[in-house]
Amino acid sequence: MLQYPQIDPVALRIGPLAIHWYGLMYLIGFALVYAFGRRRITSGHTTSMTVRDLEDLIFYSVLGVVLGGRLGYVLFYKPAHYLANPLEIFYLWEGGMSFHGGLIGVIVVMLLFAHKKRLGFFTVSDFIAPLIPLGLAAGRLGNFINGELWGRPTDVPWAMIFPQSGDGLPRHPSQLYELGLEGIVLFALLWWYSSKPRAAGQVSAMFLMGYGAFRFLVEFTREPDNFLGLLAAGLSMGQWLSIPMVLAGAGLYLFTARPPSR
């Protein structure tokens, strides 16, 4: 069993202001997206997007992630609670974000952005898809530092005891699994896959399939939300939300891979 490194969730204090690691990870994630996106633009990988376009897209994507992530959590995970306590929807400091909701928020942003810039939607989504795992990796590291979203009890040699779980049981460090698969591995795969010319929509399709598949697998080691538990077929909410992603990605890939009709 490995020792969980208890890290102060506050990264920096400036007088009464406390900067938490989790919020800092969000900033680092967006900074990485900007850095690697700028590199692709300046290297001539794309002629459709400019650095200014990237800056605008990231700015509006922050809004999409926050609003979509919060509303996704409200609708997917605790609809009854927030229906009875609607003002708590705005209590962002209490936590509660959904990746799948955040993704929907970013898709809406990309649709509006593509329309405004007169670009094809897949031109935008194929450009940004390989960069999203960088933000995911930073976010999962923030989860690990916070000691939250831990895994299920296990006896594997690398199990850890997360103090906030309250039961003292060794558990999977599922945050690190997600960091590795949904973050590092998915980024490497998409960066390589998108380095060559692809039909419009195929990079986006690979992201949907890759993230959905990795999230589905990791959920077998992740402790389900205590207010939901496991749902139909013994699957978690995260798994049920990931299945449509994989199916949509597969359908999009097959559709875009078809030769043009004559």
Curated annotation (Swiss-Prot):
Main location: membrane
Molecular function GO terms recorded: phosphatidylglycerol-prolipoprotein diacylglyceryl transferase activity
SS bonds (residue pairs): none
Purpose of the protein: Catalyzes the transfer of the diacylglyceryl group from phosphatidylglycerol to the sulfhydryl group of the N-terminal cysteine of a prolipoprotein, the first step in the formation of mature lipoproteins.
Family from the record: Belongs to the Lgt family.
Residues of the signal peptide: none
Pfam families associated with the record: LGT
BP GO terms, sorted: lipoprotein biosynthetic process
Protein name per the record: Phosphatidylglycerol--prolipoprotein diacylglyceryl transferase
Membrane-protein topology: Multi-pass membrane protein
Localization per record: Cell inner membrane
Transmembrane spans: 17-37, 57-77, 95-115, 119-139, 173-193, 200-220, 227-247
NCBIfam families per record: lgt
